[in-house]
UniProtKB/Swiss-Prot annotation:
Role description: Component of the cytochrome c oxidase, the last enzyme in the mitochondrial electron transport chain which drives oxidative phosphorylation. The respiratory chain contains 3 multisubunit complexes succinate dehydrogenase (complex II, CII), ubiquinol-cytochrome c oxidoreductase (cytochrome b-c1 complex, complex III, CIII) and cytochrome c oxidase (complex IV, CIV), that cooperate to transfer electrons derived from NADH and succinate to molecular oxygen, creating an electrochemical gradient over the inner membrane that drives transmembrane transport and the ATP synthase.
The name this protein goes by in its record: Cytochrome c oxidase subunit 5A, mitochondrial
Post-translational modification: In response to mitochondrial stress, the precursor protein is ubiquitinated by the SIFI complex in the cytoplasm before mitochondrial import, leading to its degradation. Within the SIFI complex, UBR4 initiates ubiquitin chain that are further elongated or branched by KCMF1.
Modified residues (Phosphothreonine): 141
GO cellular component: mitochondrial inner membrane; respiratory chain complex IV
Species of the source: Nomascus gabriellae (Red-cheeked gibbon)
Length: 150
């Protein structure tokens, strides 16, 4: 994993944009490649999956969360290279309901489907786990709304 990060950094440090915007490799990687590779990783402690889930559930369960914080949290969560756990999505959907933001609930479910990508079994599993919450809050899935046909 560290080797891959170092390779990515070394490649990034040895390429530049040409006149047509294409990337060209430099002939010799200078000292910048070595400096750049050191900056591509952190020596900080790693967050466990349980701590990650708890942090996001706590974030979305804040009683005073506003619409901007909700969207910021959703956008940040979507940028991670993973599908959020159903308990995180549950907390986000409940925050949307507290704010009466139905559009965000649909966006969250669409983002989960998109993040699942080619793994067709993930999205139905998440919907199955969230079904009691969806029924309780009166939230329809994008498929129930016909948005998957557009």
């Amino acid at each position: 994993m560290l080797g891959a990060a170092l390779r990515r950094c070394a490649v990034a440090a040895t390429t530049w944009a040409g006149p047509r915007g294409l990337l060209h490799s430099a002939r010799t990687p200078g000292p910048a490649a070595a400096i750049q590779s050191v900056r591509c990783y952190s020596h900080g402690s790693q967050e466990t999956d349980e701590e990650f889930d708890a942090r996001w559930v706590t974030y979305f369960n804040k009683p005073d969360i506003d619409a901007w914080e909700l969207r910021k949290g959703i956008n940040t969560l979507v940028t991670y290279d993973m599908v959020p756990e159903p308990k995180i999505i549950d907390a986000a959907l409940r925050a949307c309901r507290r704010l009466n933001d139905f559009a965000s609930t649909v966006r969250i479910l669409e983002a989960v489907k998109d993040k699942a990508g080619p793994h067709k079994e993930i999205y139905p599993y998440v919907i199955q786990e969230l079904r009691p919450t969806l029924n309780e809050l009166g939230i329809s899935t994008p498929e129930e709304l016909g948005l998957d046909k557009v």
